[in-house]
UniProtKB/Swiss-Prot annotation:
This is Cytochrome f. It is a single-pass membrane protein. GO terms for cellular component: chloroplast thylakoid membrane. Its main location: plastid. Belongs to the cytochrome f family. Keywords: Chloroplast, Electron transport, Heme, Iron, Membrane, Metal-binding, Photosynthesis, Plastid, Signal, Thylakoid, Transmembrane, Transmembrane helix, Transport. SUPFAM superfamilies: Cytochrome f subunit of the cytochrome b6f complex, transmembrane anchor, Cytochrome f, large domain, Rudiment single hybrid motif. GO terms for biological process: photosynthesis. Binds 1 heme group covalently. The 4 large subunits of the cytochrome b6-f complex are cytochrome b6, subunit IV (17 kDa polypeptide, petD), cytochrome f and the Rieske protein, while the 4 small subunits are PetG, PetL, PetM and PetN. The complex functions as a dimer. Its cofactor is heme. The chain crosses the membrane at residues 280-300.
Length: 314
């Protein structure tokens, strides 16, 4: 457990360091590491995934997976995260940037990421440059991916290995539920509760806007004077389009900018059957016996018809 916490802390620190030095800052998003850092289990008791706490807009996703799988088999679970690729989001530096996508797949216990040497070449080609990892050392059945370029990865493919009940007594041949989530674009809230610049900012008091100035960094400073003569100042992040103007009277919490968010998060659930091979063999044997019976009945009928025809001729 201590190793797991150290790994999460290290990953979190690296993420902050990368952002601090400005690498890929235009594509900054709410990294999965934020969820990993703050939630030991990403699925709450009510079924809500942790990603939805930062990605406030709801957008649909789709899941594609086989209905049934055999023990030790490798199969694909595909999460589709569709969006309009002509749209751009507001980057952390206030400039327009393409959207990134990310996904989370919560598999039944025992199911896990397929070993690299067993992943089909076709899947490796599709996932070229994509890094899929377990949520933590404790939950290797929960897989996360992202952030990655959305224009080329609207279909997230997870190669999964099914468990073998013969080797693990805790696994049974049953129908299991699994859960998936996918987001496009940056989050509106950081894990600390602070708003990101992909959000709507409300007026901190009622009153008249006496002055609006823009700094060299592109930030907007808004002065609001209330009826009691108290003046407050608000600073809005760079890149936001204001929905108010100087001299306008506003109410408390009235939006000061147009909603810049073009992304959103969605989650779905489905089921998968861990099929017993013996049942399949039994089913095939049953089908074969039915086929043989049908053939025998047809042959018997033909034989009977020949006997009847011979008696009539006699």
């Amino acid at each position: 457990m201590a190793t797991n916490k150290f790994f999460k802390s290290l990953l979190f620190a690296l993420t902050i360091a990368i952002n601090s030095f400005g690498f890929c800052i235009q594509d900054a998003v709410a990294y999965p590491v934020f969820a990993q850092q703050n939630y030991s289990n990403p699925r709450a008791a009510n079924g809500k995934l942790a990603c939805a706490n930062c990605h406030l807009n709801q957008k649909a996703i789709e899941i594609e997976a086989p209905q049934a799988v055999l023990p030790n088999s490798i199969f694909e679970v595909e999460i589709k995260v569709p969006y309009d690729t002509t749209k751009q989001q507001l980057g952390a530096n206030g400039k327009k940037a393409d959207l990134n996508v990310g996904g989370i797949l919560m598999l039944p216990e025992g199911f896990k990421l397929a070993p690299k040497n067993q992943i089909p070449a076709e899947v490796k080609e599709k996932n070229k440059g994509v890094f899929i990892s377990p949520y933590s050392s404790e939950f290797d059945n929960i897989l996360v991916v992202g952030p990655i370029a959305g224009k080329t990865h609207q279909e997230l493919i997870f190669p999964v290995m099914a468990p073998d009940p013969e080797k693990n007594s805790d696994i049974k041949y049953l129908t299991y539920p699994f859960y998936a989530g996918g987001n496009r674009g940056r989050g509106q809230v950081y894990p600390t509760g602070e708003k990101s610049n992909v959000n709507v900012f409300g007026a901190n008091q009622s009153g008249q806007i006496t002055e609006i100035t823009v700094t060299e960094k592109g930030e907007s400073t808004i002065l609001i004077l209330n009826s009691n003569g108290k003046q407050t100042s608000q600073v809005l992040p760079a890149g936001l389009i204001l929905s108010i103007k100087q001299g306008q009277v506003v109410k408390a919490d009235q939006p000061l900018n147009i909603d810049p968010n073009v992304g959103g998060f969605g989650q779905e659930e489905s089921e998968i059957v861990l099929q017993n091979p013996i049942r399949i063999y039994g089913y095939l044997a049953f089908c074969f016996s039915v086929l043989i019976t049908q053939i025998m009945l047809v042959l018997k009928k033909k034989q009977f018809e020949k006997v009847q025809a011979a008696e009539l001729n006699f």
